[in-house]
Amino acid sequence: MKHPVPHKTQSNTYNCGPTCLEMLLEFYGIPYDSEKIDALCETAPRHGTDNQKLVEAAEQLGAHVIVKENAQLTDIISLIESGHPVLVNYFNCKSGVGHFGVVKGIEDQALILADPKNGDDYPLTFDHFQQHWHNHTRTIHAWMMYVAR
């Protein structure tokens, strides 16, 4: 099962969060302006995007979002099965930093992400994802956000 989340590529090394928010908003047909999203998220080269700023930006742009920390893989699976792509914050082993991606599907014991850095249809096995479902400092665990409609 996979949802048609439009893929976008991040424009620099630190704006994966706003880029993922753009993907979600476009999926739901919510109008947005890329520059406004970057400004609302207060994204910066040194630290990227704060989870809460991402939530606030989504709400200011008209999306009703639900956030969960310390979530379970089953939460993501249930949301995907009910038609909701899920924005997640995870540790990207390829780049060694915290990263945002949009889970858009499930195939063969793997999550399929629309990932602004690693590409569209980027697979992460359930085991790998669960081991790395935290921010780069390990202060936020199993964080997810989705648009409630």
Role assignments for model-derived ranges:
Residues 36, 68-71, 90:
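Short loop/turn and capping residues at structural boundaries
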Residues 56-82:
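Helix-adjacent hinge/juxtasegments
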Residues 25-30, 59, 63, 134:
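Sec-exported extracytoplasmic/periplasmic mature domains
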Residues 41-47, 62, 81, 85, ...:
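Noncatalytic regulatory segments and standalone regulatory/sensor domains
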Residues 1-46, 92, 107-109, 148-149:
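Active-site-adjacent structural segments surrounding the nucleophilic cysteine of cysteine proteases
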Residues 18-22, 34, 38, 51, ...:
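Extracytoplasmic/secreted envelope proteins and their assembly/folding machinery
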Residues 87-93:
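Short beta-strand segments that buttress and anchor functional surface loops
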Residues 96-101:
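Short, surface-exposed coil-to-beta transition loops
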